[in-house]
Amino acid sequence: VSERVDRDGPRAWQRREVLRYAAATPVLFVAAATLTGPTACAQSLRLVDFTHRQVPADQIKAAGYDGALVYVSELRPGADFDFKPVTREYADSLRAAGLHVVSCYQYGKPGWPTPSDYTRGYDGGVADARTALRLHAAAGGPESAPIFFSIDEDIDLDTWKSVAADWLRGINSVLGVNRTGVYGHSRVCAWAVDDGVIGPSTSSGHWWAWQTRAWSAGKREPRAVLYQAVVVTGPDTGIPMGGTQVDENEVLAADFGQWDLDRT
């Protein structure tokens, strides 16, 4: 998720410096389903995510990336981003360029009049899932693809148990568990898998978990399908592209939630 502020609190700088030098673990893929679009079994696929400015598909491809995560959420009041929600035209341009597309959702954010989405509990999850499903379909997203819902802050286990897990259960009630994914730190990803509130990838041993390096203290959740290795936050400027800065994500499984994978 690319709409960043200095999110980590007083220890933000120290944690970023540790993470900056953490070594990434190579991952081997095993193909898990039949593809109807670009191949997804290579070892080094990378995706970008961004919100502030829409990056043309040809620039993503020219920079050597394999796809993008796109927002199926409305633009919150006061924000001036031009990439929420994703349009059918833009999604089609990505696919025409041979790029993978993955859906994600974030509306609220800490420090804004619209609070973090998960704070609204079960009923908020129901409402968010309905919006996400509508915008995903409008952009051409298939019925089999998951949507990753963001927990874009450093929550603890008590917060997870008291409100965040119920938010995801509300999402489950609309999308079904099998299409529900989550974005968050390593512990959020682990809790979501363990509590059964996100679905499994068709790649064995992986679930719809998109881990960010932020707040993860260098730890990796091995069951995730995506890892956000470069994050635009504070002094970390991300990857320059298309007149904006983007986050970079490593693909960890053959089925990482891409639209072009046939899961039937």
Q: Can you say where each PLM-predicted feature lies in the sequence?
A:
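N-terminal secretory signal peptides
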Residues: V1-W13, P26-A31
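Substrate-binding cleft of extracellular glycoside hydrolase catalytic domains
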Residues: R46, F50-V55, V70-D156
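Functionally critical loop-and-helix segments that line ligand-binding/catalytic clefts
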Residues: S44-R53, A57-I60, C189, D194-T264
